[in-house]
A protein has these predicted regions:
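Bacterial N-terminal signal peptides
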Residues: 9-17
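Inhibitory N-terminal propeptides of secreted protease zymogens
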Residues: 21-95, 120-123, 261-263
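Protease zymogen maturation seam
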Residues: 73-131, 139-147, 160-161, 165-202, ...
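Flexible, small-residue-rich helix->loop connector segments that border functional cores
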Residues: 135-145, 178, 185-193, 203-231, ...
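Active-site glycine-centered loops adjacent to acidic/histidine catalytic or metal-binding residues
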Residues: 136, 296, 357
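Catalytic-core environment of secreted peptidases
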Residues: 163-164, 168, 186-201, 210, ...
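Catalytic-core segments of hydrolase enzymes
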Residues: 219, 249, 253, 258-348, ...
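Hydrolase catalytic cores
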Residues: 222-223, 233-239, 254, 262-263, ...
Length: 416
């Protein structure tokens, strides 16, 4: 850079930037192919924190956010502050024990799986040779229900590959069991397999109240139940406090594509219409990766991202009567619904849990996508929508606000 150009750039920086805050600001930037991030960082007085491989997308700590003219002069194509993303909350009714003689995937016979005819689809496809990335919190690799269902993933929190280490049982999450009455309608199913609800004295070591530690295991358990021959790639982006950010999630989406995922489940959301998320989703779609996301648990039609982004299979929650779950989001951006009330799934430490939330509806759709993707490489979303059951009549207050309806796995995989 000549002395004259440097002077002009410095003048622009002084003229168009806001006053420097006390603390640096995390800024995501995508630069043009001809720009150099080292030079960009130097001109902004910034520190380079991280880079997304093969994307020209970088995370900087900047003293000030450059104005649009300044950014343009440096070759920055777009930029946004790296905002935080919090793990969605969910209702947890109970933690269950199941006798060791019971098969690890006993919960695939639960009422919600019967409603969507998941078992009826397995003679036609089991998800063989399909990798499903699950962008989530930590997963219990040693859980009986997940053994043989997990492939190598990556832990973006600790920045190292994720492998076969089981969770420390002394740190697994536990919520109050006072509402076990909600399980009454499922007692018959539980009794078939000898499942029992832990009381507080039995579960005394399960003291962590943060759901982030169990969320990844619960979602993986749902995927494994629906597509048992698929391989789940756990990508941890949420720490044990349930915190992540836009940059880390965008990095994980691209990692999934570059490491062979054909389906990606995203059971989280943010109100931020993020350019980085949109860029990552478009990258995945261009690679023919099926992207599934939970619609959110705020009982609103306000869009949640990435679910509301074009091409993402946004999934709401319904109950066993095909009524919209009281907590579930709805709206014009929805693709389908799936059961999300009182779902049985794997829980860290070899236990099982009963949970509610759109977080557990999305993995049902992701598992269904894996079954279809095992049979054919195109038309996955069309197969899911065409096979879905219209539930407008059961939800008169949400007509055309619940997408194509509630999924029917058997019909999506092998139409009558």
């Amino acid at each position: 850079m000549t002395r004259r150009n440097f002077s002009l750039t410095l003048i622009l920086l002084l003229a168009f930037s806001v006053s420097a805050p006390a603390n640096p600001l995390p800024l995501i930037v995508q630069i043009s192919p001809t720009a150099n991030i080292t030079n960009v960082a130097a001109m902004l007085g910034a520190t380079l924190v991280d880079t997304i491989p093969r994307a020209n997308i970088h995370l900087l700590n900047v003293p000030v956010v450059p104005s649009s003219p300044m950014a343009y002069s440096l070759g920055i194509e777009w930029m946004e502050l790296n905002t935080g993303v919090t793990m969605p909350g969910f209702v947890q009714v109970g933690i269950l024990t199941v006798p060791g003689t019971t098969v690890s995937d006993w919960y695939k016979y639960q009422p919600s799986m019967q409603l969507i005819r998941a078992g009826a689809a397995l003679p036609y496809s089991t998800g063989q040779a399909v990798v499903v990335a699950d962008i989530n919190s930590q997963v219990d690799y040693g859980h009986p229900a997940l053994r043989g269902h997990l492939t190598s993933g990556y832990d973006f929190v600790t920045a190292r590959p994720a492998g076969s280490t089981a969770l420390n049982q002394a740190e697994t999450g536990f919520l109050d069991q006072a509402e076990t009455g909600f399980l009454d309608s499922e007692r018959g199913f539980m009794n078939q397999f000898g499942a029992g609800v832990l009381d507080r004295s039995q579960a005394g070591f399960l003291y962590s109240l943060n759901p982030a530690y169990s969320h990844g295991t619960l979602c993986a358990g749902v995927i494994a139940a629906i597509a048992p021959a698929s391989m789940i790639m756990p990508l941890r982006v949420f720490d044990d406090a349930g915190r992540s950010d836009i940059f880390t999630i965008a990095k994980a989406i691209r990692y999934a594509v570059q490491h062979g995922a054909q389906v990606t489940n995203m059971s989280f959301g943010t109100l931020t219409a993020s350019p980085a998320l949109r860029n990552a989703i478009n990258y995945a779609r261009n690679a023919d990766v099926v992207m599934v996301a939970s619609a959110g648990n705020n009982n609103t039609s306000n869009p949640q991202y990435p679910a509301a982004l074009s091409g993402v299979l946004a999934t709401a929650a319904t109950d066993l009567l095909d009524w919209k779950a009281s907590f579930s989001n709805y709206g014009s951006s929805l693709f389908v619904t799936a059961p999300g009330v009182k779902i049985f799934s794997a829980y860290p430490g070899g236990y099982y849990s009963v949970v509610s939330g759109t977080s557990f509806s999305a993995p049902m759709v992701a598992g269904t996508a894996a079954l279809i993707r095992s049979l054919r490489t195109t038309g996955v979303s069309t197969s899911i929508s065409a096979g879905s059951v219209n539930i407008n009549s059961r939800n008169p207050g949400y007509v055309n606000q619940l997408g194509y309806g509630r999924i029917d796995v058997r019909q999506a995989v092998h139409p009558n």
